[in-house]
Amino acid sequence: GTLTGLTVSADSTINSVTVGKGANSVSGNTVLGEGALDASVTGGNNTAIGKDALTANTTGTDNTAVGPFSMYTNTTGYENSAFGTSSLQLNTTGDGNTAIGRLALQKNTTADNNTAVGQRALKENTTGASNVAVGALALDANTTASYNTALGHQALTGNTTGAQNTAVGYYSLVANTTATRNVAVGSQAASANTTGDDNTAVGSFSLTANTTGAQNTALGKSALQQSTTADNNTAVGFYALGANTTGFMNTAVGGIAADAVTTGSYNTALGYEALTTNTTTNSNTAIGYAALKLNTA
């Protein structure tokens, strides 16, 4: 037969799945799932879909939780959005967070205004605020650091407390832990950096080996690629200063400019192939195409 005109004035349970407004039938709440919005006292305008979604919510308002255990422990947090299994699972009082993807922002507790899109994005974050992570495992290990931006698979994935970093591209700044104010744009840019601060790497594999070196600027594919602990180098152009390891205060502008310098310092090379064979000497100045190309002294 056909059932028409059915009116149900209270929550209903169908095969252990609750459909309705949740505990206390607070106005504006929508519930679909076993245990969803189970503890709500006065929190209104919440949407909970999935097993135990928003189950502990008491006074939090304007939250959306879609997926099993999404926003599971939220109590008073408001204006959060969680889509995916266990997304924002441990949030209690954090506000204005957006988590899309399985385990996204899972351990966030009290932090506000984070955006995580992708599986495990910002998963370990607890109190770090105003972070943006887009991509699977982006900012995965971040705990208390704030104001980081990671766009790309595993971008800034190892970061824990380093703040104000920007990583755009696959594996960019992947090993960064506590370093701050770094900018890495390009596949594997500054991927080995751990504690070096204030570096700028733009281009695939630029500054890729840097670990603790600080205040370096690398613009171009593989620029300063092999630099590890050196500071205050500037390389602009394909593989400019590409072989540098520990040399410091060098400036190379032009494709493969000073590309062989390894430990030399205070060198200036302006022009394509300028100072290309110099390795360990210091304080050279080469301006123009292939200037001092064969210089070794």
Predicted regions and their residues:
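Glycine- and small/polar-enriched repetitive beta-structure motifs of secreted/surface proteins
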Residues: 9-297
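N-terminal low-complexity, intrinsically disordered "leader/linker" segments enriched in small/polar
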Residues: 2-9
